[in-house]
Amino acid sequence: MSYKLKFLPSALKEWNKIGSTIRDQLKKKLKERLNDPDVPADRLTGFKNHYKIKLRSAGYRLVYEVDQGNVSVIVITVGKRERSEVYIKAKKISQ
């Protein structure tokens, strides 16, 4: 079953700011995740139903939430991993 992709407004702004190369890499990974979003290895501790997509070489992270009720994947935030900023931002948004 394929999930629908949704963005929080703040995440969409961040998405539009990143370069096209990084965006293309994230699109490819997101496409895979829409078929199977529950990846235990990428589950974020301290969050409920939140997962990450990592681009190690670029240092970017995308944090998303799986909404089983609406069969959707909601992008919470996108950004550099520097000083765990992307995870701190995700925690603030999710509260």
Predicted features and spans:
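Enriched for short, Lys/Arg-rich terminal
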Residues: 2-6, 12-13, 17, 24, ...
